[in-house]
């Protein structure tokens, strides 16, 4: 994969901001960013396509719970690093589970913003 130039990094940043601020569903925002990123950095889009094809071919996600399904019991660290059990969180009410890879992941940031407005 080739490296991203500073000018292209800026173009991706602006594309993210446009997608984040656009009126539309989360899927429309994600699709718009994916298309913009392919225009700016085709090698990245091709690498993502290969990864998705490999995951789909290997059944990636087939056994994952779907929206509305009960989650299996688990523990994860909270914001201070202390392990918290799902069962203890459920005592306070419903729980939403999201996987956020980091501030550097535009797709994750769009997903968080769809669930937590203003994030």
Language-model segments: which ranges?
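Short, intrinsically disordered, charge-balanced linker/junction segments flanking boundaries
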Residues: 115-119
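Non-globular targeting/processing and membrane-anchoring segments
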Residues: 1-92
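Short active-site neighborhood of thiol/selenol oxidoreductases, capturing the structured segment around
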Residues: 86-113
